[in-house]
Amino acid sequence: EYTHAASGARLCWLEREDENKSFCAAFRTLPYDDTGVFHILEHSVLCGSKQFPVKEPFVELMKGSLNTFLNALTFPDKTCYPVASRNSRDFLNLMRVYLDAVFFPSIHEKPEIFQQEGWHYELHDGVLTRSGVVLNEMKGAFADADELLINAMSRALFPDSPYRFVSGGDPEAIPSLTYEAFTAAHKRFYHPANSYLLLDGSIDQDESFALLDGYLSQFAAIDPDTQIHAQPPVRA
């Protein structure tokens, strides 16, 4: 395990003779409301970045990369961006695209990404409605009784904890998220000091570490203040 001196990022390298090389950038993203801001961020950072200003780099990688795994995942307390490939050049390119996406996404210059992936108004035949990729996804999720039960149990069991919130977003709360709060969440939580990076497999250490350092060295270490505190006992 390593710590990047300049940025405070932590890295775990599992040195194994496995040709399937893997990389993951993970961030501790503790929800503070039901707006699903981290779910929307997970979608949005993969909609173009500083070095890769295309509309959907994720889709381009799906079409042209030799990847064996490519995804982004939102959990109740973290967001992960894993990639894998057996081809060394392809693996480094996947790392580069994902690092650029999480640290330098186009969301700060293009509010339309937030509107597309989060929520926006639409007018059809004189009827004003709300739409958005994540909003519509969570409307579908909330149509499942099991999902509603799990959310209710989390609120009851963790009333003083981030786990009481719906990390994916409550369709009733998502439209209250502003663009300003959205970009502020990225600046606060997507900092190397709040990240945990993972490398696994038969990688070229010098090339991989140099690529990581090129991105991480652009940040100064901070205290991210994202500790998870234990839930005090709850009286039934």
Q: What are these regions, as identified by a protein language model?
A:
Residues 1-18:
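N- or domain-start disorder-to-order transition segments that initiate the globular core
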Residues 19-23:
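Short, conserved catalytic-motif segment at the N-terminal edge
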Residues 26-36:
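Short pre-active-site segment immediately N-terminal to the catalytic Zn-binding motif
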Residues 30, 44, 48-53, 57-235:
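Charge-rich, well-structured scaffold segments of protease-associated domains
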Residues 35-47:
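Active-site recognition of the HExxH zinc-binding catalytic motif
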